[in-house]
């Protein structure tokens, strides 16, 4: 009788350990790799398009584990100083949307090159991952936007 009890105890310990390991595995956080994005900034991408000769680019990386978007970029040839810069969304190419995240600091001078970071909400992250964000640089001559580029996964 004592041997049967020992076998059942051992079997119970094994089953319990396996169930516990499965539970730990299923609840452990999943850390996805950062996702890279890029955007080519040009006046022809604005809505409506403009005839600026300015150009620029933005590269960005979104880290799902921290919900942090980090970016850097450059621009040149704008009609004047950039008065504000933002990420807008959600919007597909050819559509406009409101400001999602400021690239520049409101009320501060903005120049090239630039960089920054922000923590996104779940909704913002979903829109970014779905290709629904664009970068937009504004000037006095083009207050609605002089240079625009849709963020695409790179």
Regions found by a protein language model. Name each.
Residues 2-85, 89-154:
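Metal-centered catalytic cores of metalloenzymes
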């Amino acid at each position: 009788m004592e041997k049967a009890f020992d076998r059942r105890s051992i079997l119970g310990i094994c089953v319990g350990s396996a169930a516990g390991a499965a539970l730990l595995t299923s609840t452990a956080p999943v850390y996805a790799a950062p996702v890279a994005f890029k955007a080519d900034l040009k006046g022809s991408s604005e809505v409506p398009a403009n005839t600026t000769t300015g150009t620029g680019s933005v590269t960005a990386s979104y880290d799902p584990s921290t919900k942090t978007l980090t970016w850097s970029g450059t621009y040149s040839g704008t009609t004047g100083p950039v008065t504000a810069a933002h990420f807008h969304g959600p919007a597909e190419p050819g559509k406009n949307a409101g400001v999602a995240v400021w690239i520049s600091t409101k009320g501060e001078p903005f120049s090239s090159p630039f960089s920054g970071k922000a923590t996104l909400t779940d909704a913002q992250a979903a829109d970014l991952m779905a290709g629904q964000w664009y970068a937009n640089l504004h000037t006095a001559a083009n207050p609605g936007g002089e240079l625009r580029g849709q963020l695409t996964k790179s």
